[in-house]
Amino acid sequence: MQTLTVELGDRSYPIHIGRGLLDDPTRFAPRIRGKRVMIVTNETVAPLYLDRLKRTLGDFRVEAVILPDGEEYKTMETLNQVYTALLEARFDRKATLVALGGGVIGDITGFAAASYQRGVDFIQVPTTLLSQVDSSVGGKTGVNHPLGKNMIGAFHQPRCVVIDTDTLDTLPDRELRAGIAEVIKYGLICDRPFFDWLEANMDRLLARDPEALAYAIHRSCHDKAQVVAEDEREGGRRAILNLGHTFGHAIETGMGYGVWLHGEGVATGMVMAARMSRRLGWLDAEDLHRTEALIARAGLPVEPPPEITAERFAELMSVDKKVLDGQLRLVLLRGIGEAVVTADFDPAALDATLNQVGSGN
C-alpha cells in the first residue's frame, strides 16, 4: 500500500492506494468521528462491494442508500434521495457519508455531505479508474443542470480517499479507457516525464497490468494533490486540471448526459485544445502529433461528434464555470507538460477549431 497526503493545513487528508483496502478497517476507522455511517452507492456497484464495505465498517452503525447508475442521474432529484435517506434515518451532524462508486457517486455524495445540516464528513471510495485518479481527490462536488455540467455544487474536502485497485477488475473496458483519458491529462498539463512513461506503457495499462495501473494511479494522484495544495478553490493554477473539459463538457451536454462518457469527452476536448494551441503557434507539430497518437492508442475518440455544430459548441461553451465577466477562459498547451489558463487568445483560432469539427484537422 502507498499513501499520499493532500496538504491543506488542518484539513489535510490521506489518499491510500493498494489492493484489498476495502477489507481493511484501519484505513477507515481513524477518519470517522461519529458512530453512524451512510454508504452511498449505485445499482451496479452495490452487488459487487457493498456487503464487503459494511463488514469492514462493522464497528459503526451502517446504513446504505442505493442510487441509479449513470451520468444522466447526476441531478438534484437523485441528490434528494440521499437527503431523504439521511433524514428518515435521523442522521445528525456527526454523520459520515461514504461514497462507494465512480465519479457520479462521489460528486453526489460529496455535495450531500457539504450541504446536509450545513456540512458533515465524507470519505471517498472510488471504484472506477477515472474517479480514482481525478474526481475523488480535491473536494469538488456537485450535480448537473440541463443547461450545463457541474454548475451546481460546492468545494468540500473528504476525510480520506481509499483506493482499492482490485475494484478495477470489474470495470468495463470502455470505463477503463475513459479513466485513462484523465491519466493522460496529467502528463499533458504538468508532467512531461509521465507522458513519456505513458507512451511506453499504454499497452500494459490497457491489458490491466496491476503494477502499471498502480503506478499510473499513484502518479496521477500525486500530480493532482500538488496542484490542489497550491490552489484549493481554483482561483488560478488549479484550473489547468480542466484541460479538455470546456470542449468535453460541451460534448457531454450537447449529446445528452451519459451518451459520451466523461473521459471520452475529455479525450476529444484535449485533442481540440491541442489543435487550437497549434493554430496559435504555442504547440509544435511533434507535440500535437504525440498527443493525438497517445489518445488514439488508448482507444479514445479524437474527433468530436458531427451532430454538434460550431455554433452549438460556442453556445454550450458559454455556460462554463471558467467564464468570468463574460470572457471564456480556456486551458491550452505551450508544450507537453505545460498548460496555461488564458482568455488572451485569438478568437479566430477558436473559430477555426470549432469549424473543423468532423474534418479531422
UniProtKB/Swiss-Prot annotation:
Binding site for NAD(+): 69-74, 103-107, 127-128, 140, 149, 167-170
Residues binding Zn(2+), per UniProt: 182, 245, 262
Transmembrane segments: none
Documented EC number(s): 4.2.3.4
Compartments reported by the entry: Cytoplasm
Keywords: Amino-acid biosynthesis, Aromatic amino acid biosynthesis, Cobalt, Cytoplasm, Lyase, Metal-binding, NAD, Nucleotide-binding, Zinc
Co-factor binding details: Binds 1 divalent metal cation per subunit. Can use either Co(2+) or Zn(2+).
Superkingdom to which the source organism belongs: Bacteria
GO-annotated biological processes: amino acid biosynthetic process; aromatic amino acid family biosynthetic process; chorismate biosynthetic process
One term of GO molecular function: metal ion binding
GO cellular component, one term: cytoplasm
Cofactor(s) the record lists: Co(2+); Zn(2+); NAD(+)
Family designation: Belongs to the sugar phosphate cyclases superfamily. Dehydroquinate synthase family.
Family matches, as HAMAP family: DHQ_synthase
Entry protein name: 3-dehydroquinate synthase
Species: Thioalkalivibrio sulfidiphilus (strain HL-EbGR7)
